[in-house]
Protein backbone atom coordinates (compact mmCIF):
# COMPACT_ATOMS: atom_id res chain seq x y z
CA UNK A 1 0.00 0.00 0.00
CA UNK A 2 1.30 3.44 -0.90
CA UNK A 3 0.20 6.98 -1.70
CA UNK A 4 1.46 8.90 -4.73
CA UNK A 5 1.49 12.67 -4.40
CA UNK A 6 1.97 15.13 -7.30
CA UNK A 7 2.08 18.91 -7.05
CA UNK A 8 1.58 20.61 -10.43
CA UNK A 9 2.01 24.22 -11.54
CA UNK A 10 0.70 25.09 -15.00
CA UNK A 11 0.12 28.26 -17.04
CA UNK A 12 -2.75 28.94 -19.41
CA UNK A 13 -1.17 29.84 -22.74
CA UNK A 14 -4.49 31.02 -24.16
CA UNK A 15 -7.51 32.70 -22.52
CA UNK A 16 -9.79 30.52 -20.44
CA UNK A 17 -13.50 30.34 -19.67
CA UNK A 18 -15.03 27.95 -17.16
CA UNK A 19 -18.55 29.09 -16.35
CA UNK A 20 -20.76 28.88 -13.30
CA UNK A 21 -24.17 29.54 -14.86
CA UNK A 22 -24.33 33.15 -13.61
CA UNK A 23 -24.91 36.19 -15.80
CA UNK A 24 -24.21 39.01 -13.35
CA UNK A 25 -21.47 40.76 -15.36
CA UNK A 26 -21.86 39.09 -18.76
CA UNK A 27 -24.14 36.53 -20.33
CA UNK A 28 -21.60 33.88 -19.31
CA UNK A 29 -19.56 34.66 -16.18
CA UNK A 30 -16.55 32.62 -15.09
CA UNK A 31 -16.70 30.61 -11.88
CA UNK A 32 -15.34 32.29 -8.74
CA UNK A 33 -14.94 31.34 -5.09
CA UNK A 34 -16.56 33.19 -2.18
CA UNK A 35 -13.80 35.82 -2.32
CA UNK A 36 -14.48 36.51 -5.98
CA UNK A 37 -11.36 34.74 -7.25
CA UNK A 38 -11.35 32.42 -10.24
CA UNK A 39 -10.46 28.75 -9.82
CA UNK A 40 -10.71 25.53 -11.83
CA UNK A 41 -12.89 22.96 -10.04
CA UNK A 42 -11.36 19.56 -9.43
CA UNK A 43 -14.46 18.04 -11.05
CA UNK A 44 -13.63 19.89 -14.28
CA UNK A 45 -10.05 18.60 -14.22
CA UNK A 46 -11.12 15.04 -13.39
CA UNK A 47 -13.76 15.02 -16.15
CA UNK A 48 -11.29 16.24 -18.78
CA UNK A 49 -8.64 13.77 -17.61
CA UNK A 50 -11.10 10.87 -17.75
CA UNK A 51 -12.37 11.86 -21.20
CA UNK A 52 -8.81 11.95 -22.60
CA UNK A 53 -8.08 8.32 -21.67
CA UNK A 54 -8.84 5.17 -23.61
CA UNK A 55 -11.40 2.70 -22.28
CA UNK A 56 -8.86 0.53 -20.47
CA UNK A 57 -7.25 3.45 -18.67
CA UNK A 58 -10.64 4.93 -17.83
CA UNK A 59 -11.33 1.81 -15.76
CA UNK A 60 -8.11 2.44 -13.81
CA UNK A 61 -9.02 6.08 -13.26
CA UNK A 62 -12.67 5.43 -12.38
CA UNK A 63 -13.25 1.69 -11.78
CA UNK A 64 -16.77 0.32 -12.17
CA UNK A 65 -17.90 -2.88 -10.44
CA UNK A 66 -21.15 -3.24 -12.34
CA UNK A 67 -23.89 -1.06 -13.80
CA UNK A 68 -25.54 -0.44 -10.43
CA UNK A 69 -22.50 0.01 -8.19
CA UNK A 70 -19.24 1.87 -8.60
CA UNK A 71 -15.97 1.62 -6.75
CA UNK A 72 -14.33 4.73 -5.37
CA UNK A 73 -11.65 6.09 -7.66
CA UNK A 74 -8.08 5.82 -6.33
CA UNK A 75 -7.45 9.30 -7.80
CA UNK A 76 -8.06 12.55 -5.95
CA UNK A 77 -7.88 15.75 -8.02
CA UNK A 78 -7.88 19.05 -6.13
CA UNK A 79 -9.19 22.38 -7.38
CA UNK A 80 -6.62 24.36 -9.39
CA UNK A 81 -6.04 27.66 -7.59
CA UNK A 82 -4.66 30.73 -9.32
CA UNK A 83 -1.38 32.05 -7.87
CA UNK A 84 -1.80 35.68 -8.97
CA UNK A 85 -3.21 38.03 -6.33
CA UNK A 86 -5.64 39.58 -8.78
CA UNK A 87 -6.89 38.88 -12.30
CA UNK A 88 -7.97 41.46 -14.87
CA UNK A 89 -10.97 39.66 -16.29
CA UNK A 90 -11.85 40.42 -19.89
CA UNK A 91 -15.08 40.31 -21.85
CA UNK A 92 -15.44 38.80 -25.30
CA UNK A 93 -18.35 39.28 -27.67
CA UNK A 94 -19.80 36.24 -29.38
CA UNK A 95 -21.96 36.45 -32.45
CA UNK A 96 -23.14 34.11 -35.17
CA UNK A 97 -22.75 35.22 -38.80
CA UNK A 98 -24.11 33.71 -41.98
CA UNK A 99 -21.97 33.14 -45.08
CA UNK A 100 -22.41 36.80 -46.09
CA UNK A 101 -21.22 38.06 -42.69
CA UNK A 102 -24.75 39.08 -41.72
CA UNK A 103 -25.63 38.58 -38.06
CA UNK A 104 -28.09 35.82 -37.22
CA UNK A 105 -30.96 37.01 -35.02
CA UNK A 106 -30.81 35.92 -31.39
CA UNK A 107 -27.15 34.91 -31.47
CA UNK A 108 -25.42 37.92 -29.91
CA UNK A 109 -23.90 37.32 -26.47
CA UNK A 110 -20.82 38.12 -24.41
CA UNK A 111 -18.73 36.02 -22.06
CA UNK A 112 -16.08 36.56 -19.42
CA UNK A 113 -12.56 35.16 -19.80
CA UNK A 114 -9.39 34.78 -17.76
CA UNK A 115 -6.46 36.20 -19.79
CA UNK A 116 -3.49 34.06 -20.78
CA UNK A 117 -0.44 33.91 -18.52
CA UNK A 118 -2.03 33.01 -15.18
CA UNK A 119 -0.39 30.35 -13.01
CA UNK A 120 -2.45 27.56 -11.48
CA UNK A 121 -1.47 24.98 -8.88
CA UNK A 122 -3.23 21.75 -8.07
CA UNK A 123 -2.42 18.30 -6.77
CA UNK A 124 -3.09 14.73 -7.76
CA UNK A 125 -3.14 12.06 -5.06
CA UNK A 126 -3.33 8.35 -5.85
CA UNK A 127 -4.23 5.83 -3.16
CA UNK A 128 -2.50 2.71 -4.51
CA UNK A 129 -3.50 -0.38 -2.55
CA UNK A 130 -1.72 -2.86 -4.81
CA UNK A 131 1.39 -0.83 -5.79
CA UNK A 132 0.29 -0.83 -9.41
CA UNK A 133 2.93 0.84 -11.62
CA UNK A 134 0.22 1.59 -14.19
CA UNK A 135 -1.02 4.41 -11.95
CA UNK A 136 2.27 6.25 -12.37
CA UNK A 137 2.14 5.81 -16.14
CA UNK A 138 -1.42 7.08 -16.11
CA UNK A 139 -0.36 10.28 -14.34
CA UNK A 140 2.50 10.60 -16.84
CA UNK A 141 0.01 10.39 -19.68
CA UNK A 142 -2.35 12.96 -18.15
CA UNK A 143 0.43 15.48 -17.50
CA UNK A 144 1.94 14.97 -20.95
CA UNK A 145 -1.52 15.45 -22.49
CA UNK A 146 -1.90 18.79 -20.70
CA UNK A 147 1.55 19.93 -21.79
CA UNK A 148 0.92 18.83 -25.40
CA UNK A 149 -2.50 20.54 -25.34
CA UNK A 150 -4.26 17.27 -25.99
CA UNK A 151 -6.25 18.18 -22.87
CA UNK A 152 -7.86 21.63 -22.98
CA UNK A 153 -10.16 23.01 -20.36
CA UNK A 154 -13.44 24.88 -20.44
CA UNK A 155 -15.38 26.66 -23.17
CA UNK A 156 -14.52 26.97 -26.89
CA UNK A 157 -11.48 24.70 -26.63
CA UNK A 158 -11.47 24.01 -30.38
CA UNK A 159 -11.47 27.76 -31.06
CA UNK A 160 -8.32 28.63 -29.16
CA UNK A 161 -9.31 28.75 -25.49
CA UNK A 162 -8.23 26.57 -22.57
CA UNK A 163 -4.68 25.51 -23.53
CA UNK A 164 -2.00 25.02 -20.85
CA UNK A 165 1.71 24.33 -20.41
CA UNK A 166 3.16 22.49 -17.43
CA UNK A 167 5.67 24.68 -15.56
CA UNK A 168 6.70 22.35 -12.74
CA UNK A 169 5.82 19.00 -11.26
CA UNK A 170 6.90 17.85 -7.82
CA UNK A 171 6.29 14.31 -6.59
CA UNK A 172 6.71 12.08 -3.57
CA UNK A 173 5.73 8.51 -2.72
CA UNK A 174 4.55 7.61 0.76
CA UNK A 175 4.48 4.02 2.02
CA UNK A 176 4.66 2.10 5.29
CA UNK A 177 8.26 3.17 5.81
CA UNK A 178 7.68 6.94 5.66
CA UNK A 179 3.94 7.43 6.18
CA UNK A 180 4.52 9.84 9.09
CA UNK A 181 6.17 12.27 6.65
CA UNK A 182 2.81 12.76 4.95
CA UNK A 183 1.50 14.86 7.84
CA UNK A 184 4.23 17.51 7.87
CA UNK A 185 5.85 17.67 4.44
CA UNK A 186 5.99 20.88 2.33
CA UNK A 187 4.36 20.37 -1.05
CA UNK A 188 6.42 23.26 -2.49
CA UNK A 189 9.68 21.38 -1.86
CA UNK A 190 8.96 18.03 -3.46
CA UNK A 191 11.37 16.17 -5.68
CA UNK A 192 11.43 17.57 -9.21
CA UNK A 193 9.59 15.24 -11.52
CA UNK A 194 10.65 14.67 -15.12
CA UNK A 195 7.54 14.98 -17.25
CA UNK A 196 7.20 11.89 -19.37
CA UNK A 197 6.73 12.81 -23.03
CA UNK A 198 4.40 10.51 -24.89
CA UNK A 199 5.67 10.24 -28.46
CA UNK A 200 2.33 8.72 -29.46
CA UNK A 201 0.62 12.05 -28.85
CA UNK A 202 2.36 13.66 -31.80
CA UNK A 203 1.04 11.07 -34.24
CA UNK A 204 -2.56 11.93 -33.35
CA UNK A 205 -2.37 15.40 -34.86
CA UNK A 206 -1.41 17.32 -37.96
CA UNK A 207 0.10 20.64 -36.88
CA UNK A 208 0.35 23.68 -39.14
CA UNK A 209 2.03 26.99 -38.30
CA UNK A 210 1.63 29.92 -40.68
CA UNK A 211 3.71 33.09 -40.27
CA UNK A 212 1.74 36.13 -41.45
CA UNK A 213 2.36 39.82 -42.14
CA UNK A 214 -0.51 42.30 -42.15
CA UNK A 215 -1.09 44.20 -45.36
CA UNK A 216 -2.69 47.27 -43.81
CA UNK A 217 -5.29 47.35 -41.08
CA UNK A 218 -7.25 44.75 -39.16
CA UNK A 219 -10.55 45.38 -37.42
CA UNK A 220 -11.90 42.76 -35.00
CA UNK A 221 -13.79 45.17 -32.84
CA UNK A 222 -14.88 45.29 -29.25
CA UNK A 223 -17.02 48.07 -27.83
CA UNK A 224 -15.83 50.75 -25.41
CA UNK A 225 -18.04 52.66 -22.98
CA UNK A 226 -15.44 54.84 -21.24
CA UNK A 227 -15.83 58.55 -21.82
CA UNK A 228 -13.13 60.14 -23.94
CA UNK A 229 -11.91 56.86 -25.45
CA UNK A 230 -12.55 55.33 -28.85
CA UNK A 231 -15.99 53.82 -29.41
CA UNK A 232 -14.45 50.70 -30.95
CA UNK A 233 -11.01 49.20 -30.43
CA UNK A 234 -9.30 46.09 -31.74
CA UNK A 235 -9.80 43.13 -29.41
CA UNK A 236 -7.03 42.64 -26.83
CA UNK A 237 -6.04 39.96 -24.34
CA UNK A 238 -3.62 40.88 -21.58
CA UNK A 239 -2.90 44.26 -23.23
CA UNK A 240 -1.89 42.58 -26.49
CA UNK A 241 -3.95 42.72 -29.70
CA UNK A 242 -5.10 39.26 -30.69
CA UNK A 243 -6.98 37.37 -33.38
CA UNK A 244 -9.44 35.00 -31.67
CA UNK A 245 -9.64 31.40 -32.79
CA UNK A 246 -13.34 31.99 -33.53
CA UNK A 247 -12.39 34.58 -36.17
CA UNK A 248 -9.93 32.22 -37.85
CA UNK A 249 -12.48 29.42 -37.72
CA UNK A 250 -15.17 31.50 -39.42
CA UNK A 251 -12.83 32.55 -42.22
CA UNK A 252 -11.44 29.07 -42.86
CA UNK A 253 -14.75 27.24 -42.54
CA UNK A 254 -16.47 29.31 -45.22
CA UNK A 255 -13.63 29.00 -47.75
CA UNK A 256 -12.95 25.36 -46.88
CA UNK A 257 -16.60 24.52 -47.53
CA UNK A 258 -16.40 26.22 -50.93
CA UNK A 259 -13.59 23.88 -52.02
CA UNK A 260 -15.13 20.86 -50.33
CA UNK A 261 -18.27 21.16 -52.46
CA UNK A 262 -16.14 20.87 -55.60
CA UNK A 263 -14.84 17.42 -54.60
CA UNK A 264 -16.61 14.09 -55.18
CA UNK A 265 -15.37 12.61 -51.89
CA UNK A 266 -17.95 12.31 -49.14
CA UNK A 267 -16.39 14.46 -46.44
CA UNK A 268 -18.86 16.58 -44.52
CA UNK A 269 -17.88 20.00 -43.25
CA UNK A 270 -19.42 19.11 -39.86
CA UNK A 271 -17.01 16.18 -39.47
CA UNK A 272 -14.10 18.61 -39.63
CA UNK A 273 -15.35 21.89 -38.15
CA UNK A 274 -18.11 20.51 -35.94
CA UNK A 275 -21.88 20.82 -36.20
CA UNK A 276 -23.32 24.25 -36.87
CA UNK A 277 -25.57 26.00 -34.38
CA UNK A 278 -28.76 24.86 -36.12
CA UNK A 279 -27.89 21.18 -35.90
CA UNK A 280 -29.72 19.03 -33.40
CA UNK A 281 -26.88 16.50 -33.30
CA UNK A 282 -23.83 18.31 -31.95
CA UNK A 283 -20.53 17.15 -33.44
CA UNK A 284 -17.22 18.12 -31.83
CA UNK A 285 -14.78 19.90 -34.08
CA UNK A 286 -11.70 17.97 -35.22
CA UNK A 287 -9.82 21.14 -36.11
CA UNK A 288 -8.39 23.64 -33.62
CA UNK A 289 -7.46 27.27 -34.25
CA UNK A 290 -5.21 28.81 -31.62
CA UNK A 291 -5.63 32.45 -30.69
CA UNK A 292 -2.97 34.55 -32.45
CA UNK A 293 -1.06 37.38 -30.77
CA UNK A 294 -0.10 40.32 -33.00
CA UNK A 295 3.42 41.74 -32.70
CA UNK A 296 5.27 44.79 -34.11
CA UNK A 297 1.99 46.57 -34.81
CA UNK A 298 0.73 50.15 -34.92
CA UNK A 299 -2.55 51.29 -33.41
CA UNK A 300 -4.09 54.04 -35.54
CA UNK A 301 -7.17 56.09 -34.67
CA UNK A 302 -9.80 57.23 -37.13
CA UNK A 303 -12.92 59.35 -36.80
CA UNK A 304 -15.60 58.16 -39.18
CA UNK A 305 -19.20 58.81 -40.17
CA UNK A 306 -21.90 56.23 -40.64
CA UNK A 307 -23.33 56.49 -44.13
CA UNK A 308 -26.87 55.85 -45.31
CA UNK A 309 -26.42 53.04 -47.83
CA UNK A 310 -29.37 54.21 -49.94
CA UNK A 311 -28.49 57.85 -50.66
CA UNK A 312 -24.88 58.01 -49.36
CA UNK A 313 -25.75 60.76 -46.90
CA UNK A 314 -24.29 60.90 -43.40
CA UNK A 315 -26.46 59.56 -40.59
CA UNK A 316 -27.26 62.06 -37.84
CA UNK A 317 -25.46 61.10 -34.63
CA UNK A 318 -23.39 58.54 -36.53
CA UNK A 319 -19.96 60.05 -35.86
CA UNK A 320 -17.67 57.57 -34.11
CA UNK A 321 -14.01 56.95 -33.33
CA UNK A 322 -12.25 53.62 -33.81
CA UNK A 323 -8.77 52.22 -33.21
CA UNK A 324 -7.47 49.53 -35.55
CA UNK A 325 -4.32 47.43 -35.62
CA UNK A 326 -1.96 48.00 -38.57
CA UNK A 327 1.08 46.34 -40.16
CA UNK A 328 1.75 43.75 -37.49
CA UNK A 329 3.05 40.20 -37.68
CA UNK A 330 1.45 37.10 -36.24
CA UNK A 331 1.37 33.32 -36.39
CA UNK A 332 -1.64 31.12 -37.02
CA UNK A 333 -1.55 27.64 -35.49
CA UNK A 334 -3.95 25.00 -36.81
CA UNK A 335 -4.20 21.51 -35.31
CA UNK A 336 -6.11 18.69 -37.00
CA UNK A 337 -7.16 15.71 -34.91
CA UNK A 338 -6.40 12.67 -37.12
CA UNK A 339 -7.78 9.95 -34.88
CA UNK A 340 -11.17 9.62 -36.63
CA UNK A 341 -9.83 10.18 -40.17
CA UNK A 342 -8.22 7.84 -42.69
CA UNK A 343 -5.03 8.70 -44.58
CA UNK A 344 -6.88 9.76 -47.74
CA UNK A 345 -9.16 12.12 -45.82
CA UNK A 346 -6.19 13.63 -43.99
CA UNK A 347 -4.42 14.35 -47.27
CA UNK A 348 -7.52 15.95 -48.78
CA UNK A 349 -8.07 18.14 -45.72
CA UNK A 350 -4.41 19.21 -45.72
CA UNK A 351 -4.58 20.17 -49.41
CA UNK A 352 -7.75 22.21 -48.92
CA UNK A 353 -6.29 23.99 -45.90
CA UNK A 354 -3.27 24.94 -48.02
CA UNK A 355 -5.61 26.24 -50.73
CA UNK A 356 -7.34 28.44 -48.18
CA UNK A 357 -3.97 29.67 -46.90
CA UNK A 358 -2.97 30.52 -50.48
CA UNK A 359 -6.24 32.43 -50.95
CA UNK A 360 -5.38 34.41 -47.81
CA UNK A 361 -1.92 35.12 -49.21
CA UNK A 362 -3.37 36.28 -52.55
CA UNK A 363 -5.93 38.57 -50.93
CA UNK A 364 -8.95 36.58 -52.12
CA UNK A 365 -10.23 36.28 -48.55
CA UNK A 366 -9.92 38.75 -45.68
CA UNK A 367 -10.29 38.51 -41.93
CA UNK A 368 -12.49 40.48 -39.56
CA UNK A 369 -14.66 43.51 -40.25
CA UNK A 370 -14.41 46.40 -42.70
CA UNK A 371 -13.05 44.05 -45.37
CA UNK A 372 -14.84 46.06 -48.08
CA UNK A 373 -12.45 48.97 -47.42
CA UNK A 374 -9.28 46.88 -47.49
CA UNK A 375 -9.01 45.63 -43.93
CA UNK A 376 -8.01 42.11 -42.93
CA UNK A 377 -5.44 41.31 -45.64
CA UNK A 378 -2.33 39.23 -44.95
CA UNK A 379 0.80 38.02 -46.71
CA UNK A 380 2.01 34.49 -45.92
CA UNK A 381 5.71 34.46 -45.04
CA UNK A 382 6.21 30.81 -44.06
CA UNK A 383 4.20 27.60 -43.72
CA UNK A 384 5.28 24.75 -41.44
CA UNK A 385 3.59 21.34 -41.34
CA UNK A 386 4.69 19.09 -38.48
CA UNK A 387 7.83 21.24 -38.02
CA UNK A 388 8.77 20.94 -41.71
CA UNK A 389 8.82 24.00 -43.95
CA UNK A 390 6.71 23.60 -47.09
CA UNK A 391 6.50 25.62 -50.29
CA UNK A 392 2.94 26.87 -50.68
CA UNK A 393 3.16 26.96 -54.47
CA UNK A 394 4.40 23.36 -54.73
CA UNK A 395 1.83 21.95 -52.31
CA UNK A 396 -1.28 23.38 -53.98
CA UNK A 397 -0.27 22.96 -57.61
Task: Give, region by region, the residue ranges found by the protein language model.
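Small/polar/charged residue-enriched interaction surfaces, especially the RNA/DNA-contacting tracks
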Residues: 1-397
Amino acid sequence: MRKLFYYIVMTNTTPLHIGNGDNTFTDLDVIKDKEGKFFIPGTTLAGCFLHSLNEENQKLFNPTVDENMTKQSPFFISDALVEEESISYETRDGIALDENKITIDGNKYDYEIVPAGCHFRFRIEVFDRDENVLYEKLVDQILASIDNQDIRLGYKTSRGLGAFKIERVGSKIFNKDNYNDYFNFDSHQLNNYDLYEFEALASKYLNMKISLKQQGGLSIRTYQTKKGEADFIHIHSGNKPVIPGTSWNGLFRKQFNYYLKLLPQEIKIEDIFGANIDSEDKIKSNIYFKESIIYDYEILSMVRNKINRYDNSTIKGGLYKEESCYNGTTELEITLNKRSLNSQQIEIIKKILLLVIKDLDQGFIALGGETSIGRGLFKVEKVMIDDKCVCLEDEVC
